[in-house]
Amino acid sequence: MIKRVSDSYKNHLVAFTLGPLLKLIEAFFDLLIPLFMKGVIDLNQYDSPELISNVFTRRLAEFIRLFGTWVPSNQALSDALIGAVIILVMGIIGYVLTMIAQYIAARTAMNVGTEVRESLFNKIINLSKKDREQFGTGRLQTTLNSDTYQVQQGVLFFIRLVARAPFVIIGALIFSFILDWKIGLAFTVIVPLIWIVFFIVLRKSGKQYVSIQSSLDDISTKSTDDINGARVIRAFNNQENENKSFKTITETYETKSVNVHKLNSLINPIVFAITAIVTIAIVFLCRETLLDGSDSEKVVISSTIIAAMAYLAQIFFGVVQLPPVLLDIIKAGVSRKRIDAILTYQSSIESGTEESKDNIVIEFKNVCFSYKDDSNHYALTNINFQINKGQTLGIIGGTGSGKSTLINLIERFYDTTEGEILYKGINIKDYDLSKLRSEISLVNQKSSLFRGTIKSNFLMANSSASDEQITEALKKAEAYEFVSQYEDYLNHEVNEGGSNFSGGQKQRLCIARGLIINPEVLILDDSTSALDLLTDKKIRTTLSAINDMTKIIVSQRVATIADADLIILLDKGRAVGMGNHKQLLDSCQIYKEIYESQIKKG
């Protein structure tokens, strides 16, 4: 995995060197062709290379004559054929070099894109919950997709054209001086003018692309929120307001995009105008020879104009190619910075290296936590408890009491603001993070199933799990009964989000998946809320028989946590009651009221 986008560039230095080099050789052949054309014309007029005044053209004419006479009866035709063959050979060589360079560019761009995308994905899935919230889902999605694509395009155009286009422009300028210093001077005037236009446009465009990518983040965030919350939106009949809100965001993106394209669209018309003026200037400079010169002089000046027009065309096409190339490279630069910001981000949750086998599995010591690092607004305040190996901890409380926050701290999705958490006697911050996550299995209330099959969802948690192990986990989670009814059993298809299962079925599958890794600690975060009390009871009875596994059960139902060895009642982030079920009924009025109210409801 790479640490920066530039690391991927370094992995492909040969391609970044060889690709442009091949394009430069191909471009050099292209630059020679107009001079060969002029050499053939001048040789036909003077019959002997020695009579040609232009030294460079004379040398090319002499080179043509080295191949002898192919048509003895017609030297002019022979020279023309030889010149045509030479030009054809250069064209074929240039074509072959271009194809090789194009392949190198495409292959390298895909490789860089793959390396960046894989490294970025790996970084994102290893970010803590706090880190992901800081970046925002929209930003992460846009960076993974759009920004990676922009970097890929930047690599493609860099290898293909970033060296060739300037080389052709400068080369055509040099060869125009070889043709005629006045023509070269005219060309020299237009290149700085064009570059001034480029500089102004590209400077403004670069700033606008940063804003455009930010708007893409907003679109991604909004669309993700609305798609995930579509049922809620429909339930409140709020479709129209959401449509208006989304329309506002997309129109902002559209306005920014249109503005930058308007700016970029100025380049070609300006280049066309400058080129047209130079064409007129060339004809004007050669007017005296064309009108009053001898026949030989007229032919020579005509060949010069033909070659000059060819070089002007090369300058023009080189200039036309540069804006999209440079714009893509600028966009790639913006995207590279956004990607590097994530790849180089120092996570607030750093892994430790220590391990232990202490009998006390989890211990909270004066733990306080605030989502905004604000001591005046703690989500948890002075939490103290310990749970031994094989015991069951029950956590109960109303909405917003801090139940999920406490679980997030155990999983180390966040770090404590004050106090410390010990895992197997070691400060959880010093414990190896990957080992911690492999030993603790969390099953959330929101059952997350992934598109694929039932088996593939289990293999995601434990890649070496056998069918027998999966079946055993399904039985423990009371999911075997309905899964076994499918003809394809474990190969039964799972739609996106598990939409082809009921809420209770999804929860049982997720509990089974949590068991497949044989965790040392199993956390059920209100993950039986969609189950009936009988099924809930069966699962808890099965789990209680696993003596070497510590269980943490979060629920709003007293019946679900009544058999726990230790129950913590949370209210507004504080532990207002702690003990077993009987102790809390005797000592905690709030717990007793919750229990009695639920008993009355049946």
Tell where the protein language model's regions lie, with residue ranges.
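Membrane-integrated ABC transporters
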Residues: 1-33, 37, 42-84, 97, ...
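A structural preference for long, well-packed, hydrophobic secondary-structure segments
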Residues: 95, 116-125, 129, 138, ...
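Transmembrane helices of ABC transporter permease
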Residues: 11, 15-28, 157-211, 283-295, ...
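ABC-type nucleotide-binding domain
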Residues: 358-602
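Helix-loop-helix
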Residues: 175-189, 259-338, 342-343
